[in-house]
Amino acid sequence: MKNPLKNQRAAILGSLCLAGLILFSTNAQADAQAGAATFKTKCASCHGADGKGKAALKTQDMTSAAVQNMSDAELTAITTDGKGKMPAYGKSLKPDQIQDLVAYIRSLAKK
C-alpha cells in the first residue's frame, strides 16, 4: 500500500523547489505594481482591498507579522498550491504573476 503522506510530502517539497527556482531565476524581476493589479482581481475579494483580511471570512492579514515573516518560497507555494480554504492559483496565474504578487504582499508591510 502506498503511503499518502509520503506523496504529499514529495508534492510539497517539489512545489517549494520549483518556487525557489522561480524566485532565484536571474531573468525574473518581481514587480509589486503588477502584483497590486493581480491582488485586486484575484485576492482582494477575500483578503480585502488593503490586504488586512476580512474577519467574516477569517482570512489572513497580509500586513501581519505572521505573513510577512514567511519566506518568499512559502508565499509562492501557498499561492500556487492553495492552503486551507484558499484555492490554488498555480493553474490560473503564471509564475511571474505569482512573483509579482509576492512582491506586492511584501510592500503591504510598509503601509
Describe the predicted segments one by one:
Residues 68-69, 82:
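Transmembrane alpha-helical core positions of polytopic small-molecule transporters
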Residues 19, 23, 80, 85, ...:
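Generic alpha-helical propensity signal that fires on short helical segments
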Residues 19-23, 28, 43, 59-61, ...:
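Ubiquitous "structural anchor" signal
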Residues 65:
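Conserved protein-kinase N-lobe ATP-binding Lys motif
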Residues 2-14, 47-50, 69-74, 89-107:
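Periplasmic c-type cytochrome electron-transfer domains
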Residues 1-33, 111:
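N-terminal export/targeting leaders of redox proteins
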Residues 32-60, 77, 81-87, 107-111:
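Periplasmic/extracellular electron-transfer cofactor-ligation site
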